[in-house]
Design a protein with these regions (language model features):
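Conserved SAM/SAH cofactor-binding pocket of Class I
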Residues: 32-126
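Mobile active-site "lid"/loop adjacent to the S-adenosyl-L-methionine
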Residues: 117-146
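Short, structurally constrained coil/turn elements
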Residues: 9, 36, 87, 178-181
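Core SAM-dependent methyltransferase catalytic element
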Residues: 199-206
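Conserved beta-strand segments of alpha/beta enzyme cores
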Residues: 14, 64, 90-92, 183-186
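Class I SAM-dependent transferase core
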Residues: 1-37
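Conserved Class I SAM-dependent methyltransferase catalytic core
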Residues: 20-23, 141-198
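Residue-level signal for inorganic ion chemistry
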Residues: 30, 116, 147, 205
């Protein structure tokens, strides 16, 4: 692992980041948009370095959080971050593929799922020669359809799925969610500056 260092998330919480696996404003916005209610059972699909579960556990009162990550380095960072903050009893970090989520969560029992997925479809934009960076930016190992299917498979009836994406993918996201029985209920558009076009959307579906 290269360039590992700790970044503060809150006065009593920090996360281990690297060049390949870090967090940004989108991550923070999604964590708070998808704020868990008291005693909810939650999952973060493709947790990266574990920022969203750490923020959930620090700021809210969920019953339990499952954090799923496919990449070896990101998984290791998330695991170390959970341990560093003393959250082992509250957050379970699992190395796994969300396309095979039923191997991890066999039944639809969870209250809340969140995902900060790759923003670009395969073939859109420039490719990154670094495989880890490429997987984080393009839908190489996880498509919008994979994300929606995973949400459907883990959420109980009435459970909430929260996602962030680029505005140009909004119609795709709504259509895919509906095809998996997840009806969009809440939408927030994010602008970087006043009088500029939105750069991000946050979507909740049930």
């Amino acid at each position: 692992m290269e360039n590992l260092h700790w970044e503060p998330l809150a006065p009593a919480c920090r996360v281990l980041v690297s060049r390949e696996h870090t967090f940004n404003t989108d991550t923070i916005l999604l964590a708070h948009f998808a704020a868990p209610k008291h005693k909810e059972r939650c999952i973060d699909l493709g947790t990266g370095c574990g920022t969203i579960p750490l923020l959930w556990q620090t700021n809210y009162t969920p019953r339990h959080i499952t954090a799923v990550e496919l990449g070896e380095q990101a998984f290791s960072q998330a695991l170390r971050s959970v341990s560093e903050n003393g959250y082992e009893e509250n957050i379970e970090v699992i190395r796994g593929d969300i396309r095979e989520i039923k191997k991890i969560i066999p039944h639809p029992t969870l209250d809340l799922a969140a995902c900060n997925p790759p923003y670009k479809a395969v073939g859109a934009g420039l490719r990154n020669p670094d495989e880890r960076m490429e997987n984080a930016r393009h839908e190489c190992t996880c498509t919008l359809e994979d994300v929606a299917k995973a949400g459907r498979d883990v959420l109980r009836f009435g459970g909430r799925f929260c996602l962030c994406q680029r505005p140009e993918r909004l119609a795709d996201a709504m259509n895919v969610f509906r095809s998996y029985g997840l009806e969009p209920k809440r939408l927030r558009l994010v602008q970087q500056r006043v009088n500029t076009a939105p750069s991000l959307f946050l979507l909740e579906a049930r």
